[in-house]
């Protein structure tokens, strides 16, 4: 089974089979990225636009590299240098992009639901590169790809801890929805004000402290405080205090399984949610995540382009 839809909006709507399709498809592109000539012409004659209404380093650059390695014509759109500053609506911006016969729009927007809104109103294919606190599907797919690459079997015997500002994290939501499709055992831990009020919808274990979250985990996914989404308004005394109770350090990682791996979607706040001795240590696969992001995004763009014919 492949993926036959026009857009990629979130992992909540994906089936287990569709997720596996993307993970398998990305293998070909990972091999290409490791070769001397990192390019093919699968998207020759296609146009992609990276429309980012929020700042981004890894995601925007990754999608740009992915499109160019597939041979597409790629344009980067920044809302701060566009007619958005003159009051143009998202709907009008998307329609104007589509009117230029754009094939794929990669959209990041501060409003939850923006990607679905845009996809329903444009003929171009839309990839959700993060919409508010809602979802970030390509990050979840690259996380699962990274888990498999490091020998983790995606089933009920896999213990994954997600720790940090879960309430404001679109990465956490996409990871959770994707991992639930495989029956993965999820443990969640966050400061009380950073745990979603409706956390029970995730049907996951809610941990009381870092030690419980780390104990016996195969995978630990650390999340930063989402300062730009109100995380700065949550009361905690200092970065040092946060690190003391909610940070991952070399002592806490010892509670996890010996072959446990540590993930982080970036950017890292070193000394806050993650100490440098862990971020740069043997358990960390953070840079591997970044590397795998290109392959996953190549698989996404190639699939949506093929679906368009």
From Swiss-Prot:
UniProt: carbamoyl phosphate binding residues = 58-59, 108, 136, 139, 266-267
EC code: 2.1.3.2
Highest taxon of source: Bacteria
Q: Which GO terms describe its cellular component?
A: cytosol
Positions annotated to bind L-aspartate:
86, 170, 224
Which reaction does this enzyme catalyse, per its entry?
carbamoyl phosphate + L-aspartate = N-carbamoyl-L-aspartate + phosphate + H(+)
Q: In which pathway does it act?
A: Pyrimidine metabolism; UMP biosynthesis via de novo pathway; (S)-dihydroorotate from bicarbonate: step 2/3
Q: Name one Pfam family in it.
A: OTCace
* GO BP terms, alphabetized: 'de novo' pyrimidine nucleobase biosynthetic process; 'de novo' UMP biosynthetic process; amino acid metabolic process
Keywords on record: Pyrimidine biosynthesis, Transferase
For this UniProt entry, the molecular function terms from Gene Ontology, in alphabetical order, are: amino acid binding; aspartate carbamoyltransferase activity
Q: Which PANTHER family match?
A: ASPARTATE CARBAMOYLTRANSFERASE (PTHR45753:SF6), ORNITHINE CARBAMOYLTRANSFERASE, MITOCHONDRIAL (PTHR45753)
Question: HAMAP family this protein is in?
Answer: Asp_carb_tr
Family recorded in the similarity comment = Belongs to the aspartate/ornithine carbamoyltransferase superfamily. ATCase family.
On subunit structure and binding partners, the annotation says: Heterododecamer (2C3:3R2) of six catalytic PyrB chains organized as two trimers (C3), and six regulatory PyrI chains organized as three dimers (R2).
Function text = Catalyzes the condensation of carbamoyl phosphate and aspartate to form carbamoyl aspartate and inorganic phosphate, the committed step in the de novo pyrimidine nucleotide biosynthesis pathway.
- UniProt-listed NCBIfam families: asp_carb_tr, PRK00856.1
Its recorded name reads: Aspartate carbamoyltransferase catalytic subunit
| Organism in which the protein naturally occurs | Campylobacter concisus (strain 13826)
Q: Output the lineage of the source organism.
A: Bacteria, Pseudomonadati, Campylobacterota, Epsilonproteobacteria, Campylobacterales
């Amino acid at each position: 089974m492949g993926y036959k839809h026009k857009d990629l909006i979130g992992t909540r709507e994906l089936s287990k089979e569709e997720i596996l399709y993307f993970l398998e498809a990305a293998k070909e592109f990972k091999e290409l990225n490791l070769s001397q000539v990192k390019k093919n012409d699968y998207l020759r004659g296609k146009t992609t636009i990276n429309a980012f209404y929020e700042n981004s380093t890894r995601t925007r650059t990754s999608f740009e590299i992915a499109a160019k390695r597939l041979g597409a014509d790629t344009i980067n759109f920044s809302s701060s240098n566009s007619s958005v500053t003159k009051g143009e609506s998202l709907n009008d911006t998307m329609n104007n992009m589509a009117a230029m016969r754009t094939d794929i729009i990669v959209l990041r927007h501060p409003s939850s639901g923006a990607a679905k809104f845009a996809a329903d109103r444009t003929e171009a294919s839309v990839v959700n590169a993060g919409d508010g606190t809602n979802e970030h599907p390509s990050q979840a797919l690259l996380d699962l790809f990274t888990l498999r690459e490091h020998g983790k079997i995606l089933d009920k015997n896999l213990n994954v801890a997600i720790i940090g500002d879960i309430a404001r994290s679109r990465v956490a939501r996409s990871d959770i929805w994707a991992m639930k499709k495989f029956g993965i055992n999820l443990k969640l831990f966050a400061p009380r004000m950073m745990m979603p009020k409706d956390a029970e919808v995730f049907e996951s274990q809610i941990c009381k402290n870092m030690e419980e979250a780390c104990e016996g985990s195969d995978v630990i996914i650390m999340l930063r405080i989402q300062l730009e989404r109100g995380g700065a308004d949550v009361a905690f005394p200092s970065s040092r205090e946060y690190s003391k109770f909610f940070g991952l350090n070399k002592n806490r990682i010892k509670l996890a399984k010996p072959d446990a791996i540590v993930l982080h979607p970036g950017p890292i706040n070193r000394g806050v949610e993650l100490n440098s001795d862990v971020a740069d240590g043997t358990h960390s696969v953070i840079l591997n995540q970044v590397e795998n992001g290109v392959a996953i995004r190549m698989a996404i763009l190639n699939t949506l382009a093929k679906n368009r014919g």
